[in-house]
Amino acid sequence: MPTFNSNGATLTYEEHGTGEPFILLHGLTGNRHMFEHEVNILKKYFRTIVLDARGHGDSEKPSTYTLDDHIGDVLRLLDHLEIDETYLLGVSMGSYIAQGVAIASPERVKKLMLVATKSQGKTSSMEALFAKHADELEGLDFSEKVVKVSPYIFHDLKAVGKWSHKAGQQSPSLTAKEISAANEALEGFDFREDLHGITAETLVISGDHDGLNQPEAGRETARLIPNATFVEFNQSGHAPNVEQPLLFLDFILEFVDQK
């Protein structure tokens, strides 16, 4: 699997297909395999690239890192692959990274897609949800907590469970320390005053059953980006791409002019 060096960390990525570049960024504790279904469709039209974020999947896992590190990693991936401009899609944590990239280098993002997003947070959304339900989660480890709160996060638990299990089998599991570092990287960010600098046409998709990043957070993000459209899926939670996959790909392909 190809790798590149980003500020001292070795990160793993995959490429599929040819054409204009299209980069997909996964969520917290996820990996590049989370986008297997999307890649199988997008590679017919695009040079499709999926990255294991720093601290995730097969990429190197430093003991500490930040959201700025994630953003820099994507910019260095563009440099490594000699990409001047790309379509950029991020889900949850990936959408925060995508916002940061589009703010830092607006000329390098052709179109921006933000899924299950927010534009600010004192903690990771998962840690905030755990705190909200602290009494019922007492004594549980991270994985057990995720299972317990899943009904607050997703609408189609069966589809999400199958998807996350399959993706999880294809990459190393994160240790408790690695999960903690991944959560800490998302503490205390706020892009709201900078979103006006995003020049790319933007599509924001939220699920109306998402208790992690509620639709209003996506709606706020869309309001603050000059050329953004907000869409709310009514049978999805935090994973619209998994819970309503056909509708999701219809919106994405139409947005990038492939329908």
Residue ranges and their predicted role:
Residues 123-125, 142-194:
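Conserved alpha/beta-hydrolase catalytic His-Asp/Glu region
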Residues 7-60:
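Conserved HGGG/HGGXW glycine-rich cap/lid loop of the alpha/beta-hydrolase fold
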Residues 36-40, 49-89, 250:
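Active-site loop/oxyanion-hole signature of alpha/beta-hydrolase fold enzymes
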Residues 228-259:
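Catalytic active-site module of serine/aspartate enzymes centered on a nucleophile-bearing elbow/loop
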Residues 90, 94, 98:
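Gly/Ala-rich beta-loop-alpha elbow adjacent to hydrolase catalytic centers
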Residues 198, 204-206:
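Short beta-strand/loop motif that positions the catalytic acidic residue
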Residues 209-213:
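Acidic catalytic loop of the alpha/beta-hydrolase fold
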Residues 99-103, 110-139:
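Flexible "cap/lid" loop of the alpha/beta hydrolase fold
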